[in-house]
From Swiss-Prot:
The active site is at residues 110, 363, 393. This is Steroid 3-ketoacyl-CoA thiolase FadA6. The lineage of its organism: Bacteria, Bacillati, Actinomycetota, Actinomycetes, Mycobacteriales. One of its GO terms (biological process) is cholesterol catabolic process. It catalyses: an acyl-CoA + acetyl-CoA = a 3-oxoacyl-CoA + CoA; 6-methyl-3,7-dioxodecanedioyl-CoA + CoA = 4-methyl-5-oxo-octanedioyl-CoA + acetyl-CoA. Transmembrane segments: none annotated. NCBIfam families: AcCoA-C-Actrans, PRK07801.1.
Length: 407
């Protein structure tokens, strides 16, 4: 595996196909809050304060001077109310950190904080930055999902595209939603309700097993709440196939129920990235290196199939096979998203979301990307693996892929 060389100033960027000499982007540490359910332990914490908790939790563990940070990049969806005004910058200042450090907020829908990590890695690889804090924050209890879109109704926009002549010319006025997309996926890949219920139940079972085994202990920072210290994800539920079978479909005549969907959640996550020069100058010990970052897109009507071509693209770019990947985190926005991906990519199901996914653990939108990244890193270390791959479906049909190599 690559090592940090005191004399190195640049290394070939793996998989770029051009032989360009660029610096490595090292993963120094990654943390997250436990995920709170809607109305749960984190519901009363202002989003700015929630983000500040993640930054503090990260930097307290890494013991780096906050003034050394070149930029703070945070993912957040529905940037209105307490999540407006560039929450990356506001939460950094709320944490008490230096005013001279800038911040920027990213919205790539559900993949926002995964994209934040990618932007941070790109800044380091290009040599324009040495230390980046990347992550995400979302309080869905305070700012409900799609708030930014529903606010537009007062200005005459019933959807982001309802008045776009060019959009209507290309896609018509058909429904564009994650619910329809999930149903279309289930239909195209012939996924039965019973299969999706079994998958969803497995997510809860794996999450409970991971919590009992302490798999998340090192990645979760403690949040002091009015009811005491908060350290355990609130989402996993004791369920059964019988209970799931009794639920009504999300749409009339559909196959999907609430049991197959990710949970509305609150949380924050943070990752520290550094160049090899910063590793040497600040005495840092990397846990991994960024091996590959990319994003691709697919049909916006199906919306959630992007991880399939995105994964193929990433594997082709790096020359890796799916069997070379030791652990995978793919966001469980809905059960059919992961199940279709498994059918197409032919990954070992045991390696995919081995500690449960968003169906059980929750999906705090803008924070989920860095949350999954954090869990992937911890799992790689736990099993002694080399490569981890993360991918997420996103609104509009896009998908990110990140591959890391454990050091």
């Amino acid at each position: 595996m690559p090592r940090v060389d005191d004399d190195a100033v640049g290394v070939p960027l793996t998989g770029n196909g051009r032989g360009a000499v660029m610096t490595e982007a090292y993963v120094i540490d990654a943390v997250r809050t436990a995920v709170g359910k809607r109305g749960g332990a984190l519901a009363g914490i202002h989003p700015v304060d929630l983000g500040a908790l993640a930054w503090r939790g990260l930097l307290d563990r890494t013991d780096i001077d906050p003034a050394a940070v070149d930029d703070v990049i945070a993912g957040c969806v529905d940037a209105i109310g307490g999540q407006a005004g560039n929450i990356a910058r506001l939460s950094w200042l709320a944490a008490g950190y230096p005013e001279e450090v800038p911040g920027v907020t990213v919205d790539r829908q559900c993949g926002s904080s995964q994209q934040a990590i990618s932007f941070g890695a790109q800044a380091i690889m290009s040599g324009t930055a040495d230390v980046i804090v990347a992550g995400g924050v979302q309080n869905m209890s305070q700012i409900p999902i799609s708030s930014a879109m529903t606010v537009g109704e007062q200005f005459g926009f019933t959807s982001p595209t309802n008045e776009s002549k060019q959009w209507l010319h290309r896609y018509g006025d058909q429904e564009i939603s994650q619910f329809r997309g999930s149903e279309l996926i289930a239909e195209k890949w012939n996924l039965s309700r019973e299969e999706m219920e079994r998958y969803s139940l497995t997510s809860h079972e794996r999450a409970f097993a991971a919590i009992r085994a302490g798999h998340f202990e090192n990645e979760i920072i403690t949040v002091e709440t009015e009811s005491g210290p908060f350290r355990v994800d609130e989402g996993p539920r004791e369920s059964s196939l019988e209970k799931m079978a009794g639920l009504q479909p999300l749409v009339e005549g559909g196959r999907l129920t609430a049991a197959m969907a990710s949970q509305i959640s609150d949380g924050a996550s943070a990752v520290l990235l550094a160049s090899e020069r910063a590793v040497k100058d600040h005495g840092l010990r990397p846990r991994a290196r960024i091996h590959h970052i990319s994003a691709r897109a697919a049909d916006p009507v199906f919306m959630l199939t992007g991880p399939i071509p995105a994964t193929r693209y990433a594997l082709d770019k790096t020359g890796l096979a799916i069997d070379d990947i030791d652990t995978v985190e793919i966001n469980e926005a809905f059960a059919p998203v992961v199940m279709a991906w498994l059918k197409e990519i032919k990954a070992d199901p045991a390696k995919v979301n081995p500690n449960g996914g968003a169906i059980a653990l929750g999906h705090p939108l803008g924070a989920t990307g860095a949350k999954l990244f954090t869990t992937m890193l911890g799992e790689l270390e736990r099993i002694g693996g080399r490569y981890g791959l993360q991918t997420m479906c996103e609104g509009g049909g896009t998908a990110n892929v990140t591959i890391i190599e454990r050091l």
